Swiss-Prot record:
This protein binds to 23S rRNA in the presence of protein L20. NCBIfam families: L21. InterPro entries: bL21-like, bL21-like_sf, Ribosomal_bL21, Ribosomal_bL21_CS. One of its GO terms (biological process) is translation. It comes from the Bacteria. PANTHER family: 50S RIBOSOMAL PROTEIN L21, LARGE RIBOSOMAL SUBUNIT PROTEIN BL21M. Pfam families: Ribosomal_L21p. One of its GO terms (molecular function) is rRNA binding. Belongs to the bacterial ribosomal protein bL21 family. Part of the 50S ribosomal subunit. Contacts protein L20. It comes from Mycolicibacterium paratuberculosis (strain ATCC BAA-968 / K-10). This is Large ribosomal subunit protein bL21. GO terms for cellular component: cytoplasm; ribonucleoprotein complex; ribosome. Keywords: Ribonucleoprotein, Ribosomal protein, RNA-binding, rRNA-binding.
Length: 103
């Protein structure tokens, strides 16, 4: 079995392994720079590590590949019988990371 980790960033958790490319909430890092993500769980074959003291020694590192935007989301608010319509759009800013190591 391969080694993988559950990392926390942007209020979400992602399952990552070395070499994975993931899109996460925008991070304040330049493309090409390295970042370290906090770990919630590490699985190494049959060995599962979830103890906070042991996880404090573990780090998942990744390289920022680019900053991009997610898909367009359309929001439409409507109130019946009043003529009230409100349209709004949103595109979440994302950071594309390549996981380089779980140490």
């Amino acid at each position: 079995m391969a080694t993988y980790a559950i990392v926390k960033t942007g209020g979400k958790q992602y399952k990552v392994a070395v070499g994975d490319v993931v899109k996460v909430e925008k991070l304040d890092s330049e493309p090409g720079s390295n970042v370290s993500l906090p770990v919630a769980l590490v699985v190494d074959g049959a060995k599962v590590t979830s103890d906070a003291a042991a996880l404090a020694k573990v780090a998942v590192t990744g390289e920022v590949l680019e900053h991009t935007k997610g898909p367009k989301i359309r929001i439409h608010k409507f109130r019946n019988k009043t003529g009230y319509h409100k349209r709004q759009g949103h595109r979440q800013q994302l950071t594309v990371l390549k996981v380089t190591g779980i140490k």
